Amino acid sequence: MKSDKKRNRLSIYFYGYSLVSIFTFMLTVSGCAGKGKEQEKIYQETGMFEWAEEAVREPEEALHLAEELEITRWYQETDGTTEAESTREFVKVLHNNNIEVYALLGAVEWGYEENGATLLAHLEKIVQYNMQSSEKERFDGVMLDIEPYISDYWKENPEEYMDRYISCMKKGYKFAQKNHLRTAICIPRHYDDQGLTAGLEELIKETCDEVAVMNYSCGNEIEAIKTEAVLSEKYGKELHCILEFQEIGKHGLTEKETYRNKGIDNAKETWEELQKEYENINVIRDYHWSSPVREMLEEKDAD
């Protein structure tokens, strides 16, 4: 009789202990999941455009800038063949410092070719470079800066040239996917303003992994990038907000299009506001580009 009571007490004890353990485990898992979501939301990535091909000769200069601005992605202009050995060392150094490196390439006229011939030829060079390099020396992806919309042809017939551009980019993206290259595309903030929203959606859905919007609309960035943000979230694409830092007058830039006189801190505040507005996606914060940004930092240090 006593042994039965003892067994019952033990059963109740282990049953209660099991319930407590399960409850504790569920709380722990729930807490971890919550922390994971919170960390995911606040995770910040920052990119830098580099248009000087010779920059690959001085990886320490890139590292210095990257450390100062907490850069996690570097978009380096290259054709995949020039200064290949310097490029390999450059990419390796940045990778060793947890910075992803994308090959930056593109030209206006590439976007006129429906068959994507020129784009494919340049992507092939990047693929060959990667095949001939060690894992640490390989590009993580490509940043395609192809801007056919600035041509007179486009202005005369935007629908036709948008179709050509989309055809070109689809072929490039298919090739990049086949060869394990992440693809980011630079686009202006105004395709929807031109009545080309359907084409914009097709671009985002079918031609890239990442959408890098040249959001040169100081003070109106949140509204200007709204369509792209909605479509990026819809199709699971990463969204970049590129801000301009070149001086007023360069390439016709106005005070309303560049942060040159507003300062880097002001730009950071803009990125923060964008992230708060579009909280369901991580907005990658891109500086355009290294040369004017360095000048601004030097001017700030001199004050």
List PLM regions with ranges.
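Glycoside hydrolase catalytic-domain groove-lining segments
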Residues: 170, 181, 213-252
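Active-site groove signature of glycoside hydrolases
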Residues: 126-161, 282-286
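Aromatic- and acid-rich polysaccharide-binding/catalytic face
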Residues: 71, 76, 197-224
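C-terminal motif of bacterial Sec signal peptides marking the signal peptidase cleavage site
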Residues: 29-31
